[in-house]
């Protein structure tokens, strides 16, 4: 078979990352724990947000990891899929909204052509 596009996130790779920057790695781990700790938002909501953002940032490791964590936090398949659809709309909506910039730019220039 062919090589995967994204290599596996193995224990050895994680250990090497910690070895190369232990203080930063420890700080990031603590940041992660604090962000995903119960607070104003429950775990399920935080993980659904993470699933949606992972799709927008297109991180395959995050998609897999946060989908599992969302499910463990009580999110059902339909809720997870709905979060993904919200992310898809927001990404598409961003392109749609930014067309305003292109239209303003075009309106401010003299054009010799159309299209």
Walk through the language-model features, giving the residues of each.
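C-terminal structural segments of small proteins and small subunits
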Residues: 81-106
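Histidine-centered active-site/metal-ligand motif
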Residues: 55, 66, 98
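Immediate flanking context of iron-sulfur cluster ligation sites
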Residues: 39-57, 78-84
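Iron-sulfur (Fe-S) cluster-binding segments and ferredoxin-like electron-carrier domains
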Residues: 25-26, 64-79
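Amphipathic alpha-helical segments within well-ordered protein domains
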Residues: 32-33, 50, 67-71, 85
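Short cysteine clusters
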Residues: 59-62
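Acidic, glycine/proline-rich low-complexity segments that act as flexible tails and inter-domain linkers
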Residues: 1-45, 97-115
